Amino acid sequence: MLRLITAYILSVFFTTFWGLLGLILAPFSNRLAVTIAVRNWGRTMLWAWGVKVEVEDFDKLPQDRSTIIMYNHQSSFDILTFAAVIPFEWKAVMKKEVLKMPFVGVVSKLGGHYFVSRDGSADDTQEVKKIVKEIKTGPSVILAPEGTRSIDGRLLPFKKGGFLIAMLAGVPVVTMLIWGGKNVKNNAEKKYSLNKVINVKFFDPIDVSLLPRGKKGREKLESTVRGYLEPEIEKYIELENL
């Protein structure tokens, strides 16, 4: 119990400390805010909870050009994990509710990250155009195509927005599997656990220029991303049920 209380206290401290540093850096440089404040926030938060991150096929993530990174979402610890793992500047597509979070919302806004609504709106159309325009010459973009967290870890239906962005932008798409966050923060039971392992795996980049245009291309991209993630997720579920 004492160790758990310590983790909570450290979480408040690290979020406050790195959040304040992010507030200072973000107006001047999103790159510095991400690579210093956000990355170390992820690392120290994972350390506070005793989380070990195991990464596979990191070399499949291009670092010399902008990409769209799509990941499966099951816990807020997914965000801490990719923040700790990805060493270069990125921007994330987030739900508008994030703007209400202390420090995180303000830092994200100042850093130029992107915000969309849960159910889609006219504002989202403008945000999509902004992402497509900026990613061609700017940093990589990270998004969760499910649009929300999966309680049991299984893939939820994908939203179309992320795939539309990828097809319009014409940049490679890298699929990133993150497994284990739900074992640290159990959303169903609203409880936290210590000393867990989170696994991260990257898959081969998808060249969207080789896909058909329009709806067929978008659907092909969606099925490819799902085809990477789903078998791996089912393997982890089987292992946990043994």
Residue spans for each PLM region:
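Catalytic core of membrane glycerolipid acyltransferases/transacylases, capturing the structured
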Residues: 18-35, 47-49, 63-121
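A short, well-structured juxtamembrane/interface segment
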Residues: 40-66
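Hydrophobic alpha-helical segments typical of transmembrane helices
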Residues: 41, 78-81, 94, 103, ...
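Generic preference for hydrophobic
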Residues: 55, 69, 92-93, 200-202
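Non-catalytic C-terminal accessory region of glycerolipid acyltransferases
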Residues: 125-242
